[in-house]
């Protein structure tokens, strides 16, 4: 885990026989640090897969830099804003209204809730986790009971809810995530 400061996403690096995956890429302004942490963590291996739990700029701002550094990198995002990424709409992605910077990036597939994805050498479940972001997903590895919750759940609660960004009252959705 690459632990970051307050209001910046941590990054999770998972490696196994099938390759290496990174969960979330951090702010674009932290891209140099993210690349240095990855280089040390990968120990000469390639980064094969990048997953975004949601598309706030502290979780996907480094995507473009990682895609440039690792040309064969496959990127998967939650399905909710895939059309806005495909057509790169920074207003709909809330970057412009919030004054956030997120360089355009591409994606190769979506992280569909209700499916599994192999990270390291184990299958992880993809679950919808609306609340902090209505399109957020969490990743759960049932054998070890390891959860990557991003901003859906925090150590002593849940992430900040922004009803003004999406026009949604997400408090009931947070309760549903807690019930998972």
Annotate each PLM feature.
Residues 1-43, 138-150:
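Conserved beta-strand hairpin/beta-sheet module of binuclear metal-dependent hydrolase folds
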Residues 2-4, 106-108, 128-130:
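Short Gly/Pro-enriched turn/cap motifs at secondary-structure boundaries
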Residues 10-12, 109, 114-115, 137:
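Residue-level detector of beta-strand structural context in well-folded domains
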Residues 14, 24, 54, 66, ...:
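Divalent metal-coordination and catalytic microenvironments
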Residues 18, 79-82, 88-91, 115, ...:
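Short, flexible active-site-adjacent loop segments at beta-strand->alpha-helix junctions, enriched
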Residues 20, 27-29, 123-180:
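Metallo-beta-lactamase
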Residues 27-32, 36-119:
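Active-site HxH/HxHxD metal-binding segment of metal-dependent hydrolases
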């Amino acid at each position: 885990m690459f632990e970051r400061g307050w209001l910046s996403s941590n990054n999770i690096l998972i490696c196994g026989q099938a390759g290496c995956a990174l969960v979330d890429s951090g702010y674009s302004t932290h891209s140099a640090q993210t690349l240095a942490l990855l280089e040390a963590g990968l120990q000469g291996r390639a980064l094969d897969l990048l997953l975004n739990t949601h598309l706030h700029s502290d979780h996907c701002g480094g995507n473009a830099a990682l895609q440039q550094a690792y040309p064969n990198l496959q990127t998967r995002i939650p399905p909710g804003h895939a059309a806005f990424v495909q057509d790169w709409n920074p207003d709909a992605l809330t970057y412009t209204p919030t004054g956030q910077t997120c360089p355009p990036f591409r994606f190769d597939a979506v992280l569909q809730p209700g499916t599994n994805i192999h990270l390291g050498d184990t299958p992880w479940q993809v679950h919808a986790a609306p609340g902090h972001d209505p399109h957020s997903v969490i990743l759960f590895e049932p054998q070890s009971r390891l959860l990557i919750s991003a901003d859906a759940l925090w150590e002593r609660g849940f992430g900040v809810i922004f009803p003004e960004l999406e026009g949604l009252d997400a408090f009931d959705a947070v309760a549903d995530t807690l019930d998972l």
